[in-house]
C-alpha cells in the first residue's frame, strides 16, 4: 500500500497527459478565456494561479506570490513541486515544454496527481503562453534551476539547466500580447486582489500575496497586500457581512465529506432583507448556481421548516411559508470539491452533477439541526426572521402586482415623466436615467428621439439595502424605472427572478452630475439593479454615461476634458503662443450647466460619447462593496470613497 501511494505522489513527465494542440488559441482567443477585454486579460492571471492552487490542494504548496511588474507583466511564484522537466516519452521533449506549449496538457488530467483541480476553462498555462508576447518559465526542482522562454506560445530555445537551487517551485512571468488584448493590457490591482482574497478564504491555510511594482509607497517600498485565512468560509462570511448587523453571533459552519464529496459551508443571518448565497466548485465561482445550491436550499428549507413547526411558532401564521422566506437576510458560502464537474448554463458556471444535491442537502441538514437544538435562543430569532419575511413577501407581492397591473389598466402604463423614443426594437433603443428635471429637460432637447428615451429621476432614489421589499415597489422613482423598462418579476424557474422578455431597451444608461451627489445617486441606482435586477447587469444592458468635467476655451477654440490630465494637456495645446490667462477653464458641476447641443456631442452621441458598461467581475466582492457603501457604518464607506472617488476632495 505504501509503495502504491509513493508511486502516485511521484510527480513526473509520465503524469502529464496531452489532449490537443495550441493552434486555435491565438485565432479564437475568446473561445478559450471568455473574452479579450479586461475580463479575459485578468483571466490569464487566474489560469496561472489555478495551477499553483492545484498544487496546494494536492498538499504540495503553501505560498503563492503574484506581482504586477512595472510594464504590466505578471509574475507568479509558488513553492510547489515544480513542473516536471524530464523527458516526456510520447512527445519526445521536456515535460515543461509540453505543459507550456500544448493545450490541455498537464497533471490535472491525471487523477492520481490531482484529485480535484480548478480553472473554469481548464485551458491552463499553455493558453496564457499562446496569448503572451513573452513568457518565461523557471522551475526549481531536484536541486536544479531550469529555464525556458517563449513568444506567442513558441519556445525560443529548449529547456535548459542554468544552475543549482535550494528552492522548489515554479515561477511564471508573462506579458500579454497587445495584438490580442487591444482594448487594454493594464491590470487592475483591486480586481486581482478580490480573486486572491477569495482563493485565500476558499483554501484555508494557504498564503497568497499581491504586489504592485508600478508604484511605490512613501518609504520606497512597493504596495503589497497579503491574503491568508485559517477560518476558511467562516471568515469569508464574516468578511461579506462586515457592515451588516448579524442576528446570530457566529456563522454556522461545516467542513466535512458527504457521499465522498468534500463540502465546506458557512452561513449567517443578518438584519437585511436580501439573500446572498455564493457558491463554488473546485474554487470556480458558479454564478448560475447548480446542484450544490439546490441541495443547500433543500436542506435549509427542510430542516428549518421542521424545527419551526415542532416549536409551535407557526401555528398562528395564516399564510404559507415559501423557500424564499427561509433565505431572506441570509449570507452563505458553499464550496464543494468534485472530481469530474459537469458545467451547464449560458456561461458554463452552473454545476450539473446530480450526486452533489444529496451530499449538500445531508450536510446542511445535519449541521443546521444540531445548531438549532443546541442554540434555542438563536433558533427562535431565525424563525421569527422567517415569519417576518413571509409577511413582508405577501406585502411585496401586492405592491409588485399593483405596479405590474398598471400596464393592463392604463394602456401602456408608462410613467408620465418618460419621454419615449419612436423606435420599438429593444436592440437599438436606449433609456437614459437622468438626475433631476433640469438635466432631464436638456437631455430631452438634445437626444435623438428615434431611439433615445429620457426618464428624469427626482433626487436620490430609495436605498434598497435598508428597505423591505414591499417598500421598494411603493417608491415612485423605482416604480417609474420598473414600468418604463417593461420588465416583470417571476419566471417559470424562479418566482423572484427578473423576467426580461418584455424589456424595452437594451441600453439603460445612468447619467448623473459629475460630483459627490451624482456619484451617490449612481450608486443608489446600481444597488437597486444589483439587488433586484441583476439579470440586466449580467446581460450587459446597464451603462454609465461619462459627461465631461471641464470645458477649456480660448477664443473660438474649445476642448472638453474628462480628467485633470486631459484638462492640463488641452490648456497647453490651446495656450500656444498666447498667454495662459487667455485660456478659460469651466468646471462642470452639473449636467444642467451644458446646453442641449453640448450634452448631445459629449455624452449622448454614439459617435463621440464614452459609455462604461457595468459588469460583475466578482459577485462576492460586489456584495461586500454594496453592503459597505449602503450600510450604516460610516468609517469603511469614507475610506472606500477616499480611495476610489475622483471627487473625494472637491465639490463636497
Regions found by a protein language model. Give the residues of each.
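A short glycine-centered beta->alpha linker in the GHKL/HATPase_c
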Residues: 82-87, 91
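Residues immediately C-terminal
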Residues: 54-55, 82-83, 516-517
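C-terminal interaction appendages of subunits in large macromolecular complexes
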Residues: 391-410, 425-430, 441, 445-447, ...
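GHKL-family ATPase ATP-binding module
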Residues: 1-15, 22, 44-46, 54-56, ...
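Helical (often loop-to-helix) elements that flank the catalytic cores of nucleotide-handling enzymes
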Residues: 89, 344-357, 560-566, 570-571
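Conserved short strand/loop->alpha-helix "switch" segment adjacent to the catalytic nucleotide/phosphoryl-transfer site
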Residues: 27-46
Amino acid at each position: 500500500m505504501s509503495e502504491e501511494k509513493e508511486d502516485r505522489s511521484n510527480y513526473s513527465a509520465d503524469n502529464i497527459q496531452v489532449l490537443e494542440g495550441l493552434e486555435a488559441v491565438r485565432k479564437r482567443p475568446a473561445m478559450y478565456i471568455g473574452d479579450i477585454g479586461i475580463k479575459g486579460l485578468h483571466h490569464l492571471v487566474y489560469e496561472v494561479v489555478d495551477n499553483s492552487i492545484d498544487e496546494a490542494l494536492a498538499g504540495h504548496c503553501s505560498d503563492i506570490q503574484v506581482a504586477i511588474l512595472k510594464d504590466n507583466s505578471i509574475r507568479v511564484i509558488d513553492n510547489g513541486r515544480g513542473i516536471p522537466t524530464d523527458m516526456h516519452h510520447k512527445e519526445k521533449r521536456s515535460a515543461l515544454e509540453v505543459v507550456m506549449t500544448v493545450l490541455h496538457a498537464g497533471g490535472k488530467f491525471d487523477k492520481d496527481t490531482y484529485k480535484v483541480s480548478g480553472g473554469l476553462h481548464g485551458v491552463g498555462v499553455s493558453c496564457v503562453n499562446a496569448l503572451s508576447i513573452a513568457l518565461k518559465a523557471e522551475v526549481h526542482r531536484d536541486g536544479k534551476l531550469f529555464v525556458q522562454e517563449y513568444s506567442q506560445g513558441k519556445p525560443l530555445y529548449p529547456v535548459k539547466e542554468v544552475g543549482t537551487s535550494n528552492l522548489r517551485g515554479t515561477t511564471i512571468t508573462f506579458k500579454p500580447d497587445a495584438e490580442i488584448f487591444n482594448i487594454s493590457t493594464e491590470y487592475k490591482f483591486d480586481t486581482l486582489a478580490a480573486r486572491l482574497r477569495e482563493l485565500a478564504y476558499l483554501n484555508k491555510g494557504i498564503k497568497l500575496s499581491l504586489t504592485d511594482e508600478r508604484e511605490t509607497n512613501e518609504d520606497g517600498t512597493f504596495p503589497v497586500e497579503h491574503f491568508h485565512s485559517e477560518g476558511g468560509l467562516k471568515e469569508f462570511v464574516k468578511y461579506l457581512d462586515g457592515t451588516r448587523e448579524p442576528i446570530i453571533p457566529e456563522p454556522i459552519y461545516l467542513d466535512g465529506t458527504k457521499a465522498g464529496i468534500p463540502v465546506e459551508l458557512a452561513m449567517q443571518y443578518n438584519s437585511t432583507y436580501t439573500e446572498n448565497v455564493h457558491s463554488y466548485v473546485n474554487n470556480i465561482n458558479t454564478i448560475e448556481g447548480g446542484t450544490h445550491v439546490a441541495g443547500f436550499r433543500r436542506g435549509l428549507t427542510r430542516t428549518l421548516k421542521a424545527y419551526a413547526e415542532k416549536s409551535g411558532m407557526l401555528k398562528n401564521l395564516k399564510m404559507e411559508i415559501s423557500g424564499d422566506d427561509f433565505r431572506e437576510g441570509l449570507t452563505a458560502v458553499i464550496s464543494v470539491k468534485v472530481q469530474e464537474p459537469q458545467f451547464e448554463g449560458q456561461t458554463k458556471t452552473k454545476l450539473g452533477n446530480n450526486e452533489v444535491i444529496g451530499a449538500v442537502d445531508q450536510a446542511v441538514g445535519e449541521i443546521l439541526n444540531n445548531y438549532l437544538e443546541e442554540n434555542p435562543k438563536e433558533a427562535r430569532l431565525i424563525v421569527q426572521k422567517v415569519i417576518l419575511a413571509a409577511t413582508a413577501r405577501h406585502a411585496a407581492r401586492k405592491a409588485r402586482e399593483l405596479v405590474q397591473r398598471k400596464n393592463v389598466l392604463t394602456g401602456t402604463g408608462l410613467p408620465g415623466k418618460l419621454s419615449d423614443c419612436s423606435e420599438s426594437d429593444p436592440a437599438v433603443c436606449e433609456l437614459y436615467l437622468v438626475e433631476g428635471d433640469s438635466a432631464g429637460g436638456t437631455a430631452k432637447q438634445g437626444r435623438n428621439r428615434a431611439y433615445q428615451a429620457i426618464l428624469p429621476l427626482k433626487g436620490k432614489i430609495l436605498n434598497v439595502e435598508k428597505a423591505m421589499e414591499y417598500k421598494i415597489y411603493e417608491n415612485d422613482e423605482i416604480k417609474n424605472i420598473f414600468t418604463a423598462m417593461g420588465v416583470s418579476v417571476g419566471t417559470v424557474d424562479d418566482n423572484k427572478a427578473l423576467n426580461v422578455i418584455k424589456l424595452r431597451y437594451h441600453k439603460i444608461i445612468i447619467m448623473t452630475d459629475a460630483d459627490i451627489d451624482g456619484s451617490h445617486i449612481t450608486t443608489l441606482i446600481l444597488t437597486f439593479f444589483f439587488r433586484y435586477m441583476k439579470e440586466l447587469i449580467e446581460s450587459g444592458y446597464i451603462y454609465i454615461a461619462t459627461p465631461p468635467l471641464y470645458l477649456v476655451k480660448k477664443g473660438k477654440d474649445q476642448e472638453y476634458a474628462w480628467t485633470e490630465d486631459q484638462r492640463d494637456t488641452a490648456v497647453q495645446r490651446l495656450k500656444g503662443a498666447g498667454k495662459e490667462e487667455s485660456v478659460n477653464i469651466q468646471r462642470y458641476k452639473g449636467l444642467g450647466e451644458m446646453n442641449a447641443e453640448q450634452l448631445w456631442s459629449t455624452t449622448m452621441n454614439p459617435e463621440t460619447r464614452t459609455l462604461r458598461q457595468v459588469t460583475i467581475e466578482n459577485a462576492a466582492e460586489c456584495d461586500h462593496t454594496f453592503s459597505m457603501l449602503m450600510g450604516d457604518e460610516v468609517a469603511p464607506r469614507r475610506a472606500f470613497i477616499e480611495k476610489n472617488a475622483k471627487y473625494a476632495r472637491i465639490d463636497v
